[in-house]
Every structure is written in structure tokens, then in C-alpha cells.
Amino acid sequence: MATLSFRNVKKTYAGNVPVIHGIDMDVADGEFIVIVGPSGCGKSTLMRMVAGLETVTEGEILIDDKVVNTLEPAERDIAMVFQNYALYPHMSVFDNMAYGLKIRRLPKDEIRKRVEAAAQILELGKLLDRRPRALSGGQRQRVAMGRAIVREPKVFLFDEPLSNLDAKLRVAMRLEILKLHRRLNTTSLYVTHDQVEAMTLAHRMVVMYQGVPEQIGTPMEVFEKPASTFVAGFIGSPPMNLLEVAVGGDGIVHTSDGIALDISPLAVPQQVRGRKVVMGLRPEHMLLNAQGLAAEIEMVETLGSEQLVHGRCGKHMVVVRCSTRQFSETPARVGDTLTIGPDGRHPLHWFEADTGRRVEGL
């Protein structure tokens, strides 16, 4: 196990194209960090710099307080699990898991001991003689994880390891990875674009956007107190409703196209009064037929126990997440107009109109 640190790490490609704009972060011994963000945000580039597959343009990466910028990948004592498994098709499961240890010239008895121990952890004991073509997608991914485990590295790197699996297998493998980390407690860096993976796996998550860490925090910190409109719109399904509003000195709120919101001034903090800001409301923290604003229903998504009600209020689209029972008690249908508003139990979110950052102190 080890600590992992980033000191003003930057990456620029040829032509002076910046990809990573400067990251400072400390990962504690045994911590599971998930880097999440949309395609092109720099998350995989950051992972590859830790692995030694990309050079660091500026700054330092440290493993156990030792700068590793100039070390070869094999010298960093890390193990990486890829999206596409990267198994040798002509080798058995045992040989795939043992290959890296053979390259390092470990004794045969030690190799067998490590492979069998990893196989027991991952429930691969009966599959050691099979070739990859005889395995399911989930089994292949477990073999890839087993190959990483036997190295007994200081740091695990996971590069979107579940992206090739179907929805059911992804759930199962998330649980496998959780159990694996609790058992081994190895420092881990995990890259994904899937917010569900980030929320369920991470001790802390790093939300990346355009090469910049928008927010670093525990999953619930990021969900309950997003640092920017980007984070608010990226974390949460459906994402947070964001309305451009003008707030009067008396706490009365109007949308940017002049529609009044029937919201108690008591819910409007002093920091945003007399200003133009962005107001955020989580879909699950809103109610149908509640004080707020009138919206025309444009679409209803049925998810079994829940309904997603999409409504238009002027130029803004708003989504309400409600139970099927609550929706069945509401006579409104597509094309009808009804009032929707905050449930009063959860605070509203407020962001700066120009920067998108959360209003300070809220």
C-alpha cells in the first residue's frame, strides 16, 4: 500500500494544446479515488501519467513521497486493469495471471501461491485451465483483476474496467471491486464516465471538466453541495434543474424570461438577493402541484416505481422525479399545465451567473 500525490501536474500536447491544467491532490494510503467526467476531460490522460504511459509536462507525481515522473512503468510498482481486459488468447487463465510474475523471474512456487490466492479471492479456482474464449465477459474482467492482484502492487489503476460489460454484469462487478478493495485495502485510482460507478465505489471522487478538477469530495459532498453548475448538471440522474433567475431585494424570484416563482422569501438567502444568479433544484426534491412555477408537461418517462415528468417553463426545461403513486394522483397529462416546486425539506442551490461557481457561503 502507498500514498499517491499530485503536485501542480500539467499535461500539454504538441502544438501547445493543454489537456491537464494543474492538479494538486493527495491520495491517502488505502484510499479509493474515482476520477469521473465526460469524454475528453483528461481523466484517462491523468491515469496514464500515473502509470508512466504519458509524460508529465509540468509538476510532480509522487508514490510514497518518491517522485516517479522519470521512472519506467515497470519501476513504479503499480498494476493496471483496462477496459478491454488485454488477455492473451492463447494462454490459460493461470498463465495470463502468472505472466507478469514470470517476466519478473519469481520462483515457481511463489507464482503458484499468488495465482491460487488471487483465484480464490475472485472465485476463479475452477477456471484456471480455461482459455479466455471460454469465459464470459465478467469472468474475463475478473482474470484481468487477478493479473493485477498477483503483482501485489502499491497502487491499483482501473481505466474504465466495466465499460464493455452489460448493465447486469456492471452491477455485479461493482460489488466485486468493492469487496476486493475492502479485502486488500490497496490504494486505488479508478477512471470512469459513469456517475453510478463513481458514487458507489469512491471514498472520494474527482469531477473533471476540460482538464480541471471541478470538485474533489466524498460522493455525498459532491451530490449535496456541488461546487459548480457543471458538477450539478453532471452528478445526479436526472441532473439538477438549473434556472437563470433574478432575485429581488425582498427575496421575490423571477426567471430570466420574467416568470414569477411562487417561492417563500424565507428560502432565499441574503447572499443572492438583488442579484442575477442560477438557481438549482434536484428533480427528486420537487413536487407536482406544489408552490413554485407553472410548467407545461412535454413528456413523461415511466420507470416502473418512478416517473420522470418533463415540463417547460418559458425557455427552461424542468424535470420532476416522483413516485408512480404520486403521479397517478395527478390528473395532468402531456400538454397540460400544472404547478411544480421545491418540496420545502431540501435547500435550494445557488450559483454565480457569470462563473457557474457555487455562491460563497451557501
UniProtKB/Swiss-Prot annotation:
InterPro entries: AAA+_ATPase, ABC_transporter-like_ATP-bd, ABC_transporter-like_CS, ABC_transpr_MalK-like, ABC_transpr_MalK/UgpC-like, Mo/tungstate-bd_C_term_dom, NA-bd_OB-fold, OB_MalK-like. The keyword NAD does not apply. One of its GO terms (molecular function) is ABC-type glycerol-3-phosphate transporter activity. The complex is composed of two ATP-binding proteins (UgpC), two transmembrane proteins (UgpA and UgpE) and a solute-binding protein (UgpB). It catalyses: sn-glycerol 3-phosphate(out) + ATP + H2O = sn-glycerol 3-phosphate(in) + ADP + phosphate + H(+). One of its GO terms (cellular component) is ATP-binding cassette (ABC) transporter complex, substrate-binding subunit-containing. ATP binds at residues 37-44. It is found in: Cell inner membrane. The lineage of its organism: Bacteria, Pseudomonadati, Pseudomonadota, Betaproteobacteria, Burkholderiales. This is sn-glycerol-3-phosphate import ATP-binding protein UgpC. Pfam families: ABC_tran (PF00005), OB_MalK (PF17912). It is an enzyme of class 7 (translocase). Belongs to the ABC transporter superfamily. sn-glycerol-3-phosphate importer (TC 3.A.1.1.3) family.
